[in-house]
Amino acid sequence: MKLILRRLFLWSWVLTLPLAITGGYLIVRTLDRFYTFQIRYDPRPINTTLGDNLRYEINHLLQTLRVKSTVRGIRQQTDLPRISLVVPEANLAQLRSHMPQSGFQYATGGIFIDGKLKKAKIKYRGDFSYHWRWDKKSIRVKTKKSALFEGLRVFNLQAPKNSKQLNNFLSLKLAKTFNLLAPRTELVRHYLNGTDRGIYFFVEQPSETTLRNANLMPGDIYRGEMVGKDKYSFLGLKSGDRRWLFDSASFWDKVAINNHYNPRSFAPLKKLIELTKAHKAEQSQAALSEIMDMEAWGRFSVFETLASTKHSSNSHNWRLYYDPWRGRLFPLVWDPAGWIWSPRPSGFPVISSDLHKLLFRNSDFLRARNNALKEFFRSGKDQGFLRLVSDSIKTMETEIQTDAFLRPADVTKVTNAMHKLQKQIQTTFATTKKHWIGNKISGARFHYHSAGLDLLVDGNRPVQAMRLMFDEKLADSITAKVHFETPGGKKVVDLPSGIIETDPNSIALYASFLPDLAIDYEARPLAELQVSPGYYQITFTGLNSDLRLTGLDIDRGDGWVPAQPGDSITPT
């Protein structure tokens, strides 16, 4: 027995030495990462503990060993497009010399384009530490003008932000589904100096090229950022003294310039900010409809709802394109980070900035938003996008098996998280559709008396047309006026003759009537849209007051549905 114990002791180094080396390696890497990104650099609001860093190092090492033990991992096989970068070790050392600051300076390297190595510049990118704290770092690549990569000079290789992996990729794909101005994005495999660095998201950097690829004329692209590296300090200021993006154009810059105008000119943006400050003034809404492409903004709002994103806020993440030929501002979707937050509950409008508050008081915007919802669900685009989600997850399930830099480094955990994301998207779509459509009844009530109609419009959708049916033949010439209350007082609108159609026994009004919408500015964390019935009085000229109304149908986009009569209708 003593002999056996002596021999075990003599050979114990075979076990203890590798464990000691591995433990020392993990401790050194953990302390170095924690010191670099948590002590020497202030990473707020994204903080990590020493334990978080140690767990990352252990899990990363285990994932690397798992990948290296598979044939597919050893052969670096992938079904994704490959983007191969080459950076000399000395230049990589320069990038990593004093992280994160050193990483934001371009280093010289190369990129393979059509099998040929072309010169390029590479740096790390991203406002927050999850982009560059870990081994899989987000990268920006800039090629020479004479050697574009798939038509682009500047693009990003973004590392996934969380265990769901696909949030940004899928939300940018959803933006494209809405025909919004958004950067191109693809799932790719990144190789650095011949080594597989795992799954990345190829994302175009917004520029004049983005406009050309969208068949838009060159124009200014304004960028609004006040967080991360662009953060302004308001220390010592009271909350009422702080300033945000829609307080001043001074907080904005340009990422694309119309060279027909002074590069320092921000006139369209300044006009928008003036209107935002006067958002409760009724006259500001007419001016807003003049400078904003409301069809695009309506689609953008629906996109925000379906992507459950509040990432465009008073301090962050705005990109606005100004088309000088049409004189309109368009949203450009950037870094939407979809389905990371869960607005209360999913499916409700997102009102996350002063610009949102202004838009949700604009009737042209509200009608455009309704049209965007109708087109998305009625065209089957929702089902097409859900198929894209399913296909993307299937691709990822194969690719993450050989991603040594997967974070979190747990294939099962990542797979479950992606399927959870899929269910979250399905739920958001279903909830939004149900909330928008409402119940099967018309959602409108009316009372007719003496050639006048009192109408109450309830629900979330506008009435797009109405048809009044009478028991006797009508006169050939009938006009109508609509009376309704606004925050600025009572308004009377003469309906154009072109939207009034008369048949022998009926009148059709092809006018839009909205429910009453108000914004609760005090709600937290986001302002809330409160919906109540809209009250309208319609008076007819040329209509015999003795005629009896036999019925009233309304159309909210589903065809004619009978409205409910009432003995009287009073404003709510």
Predicted regions and their residues:
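Internal "kinase-insert"/substrate-recognition segments embedded within catalytic cores
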Residues: L180-P183, D196-R299, I393
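Middle-to-C-terminal accessory/interaction subdomains
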Residues: D32, K254, H260-S313, L320, ...
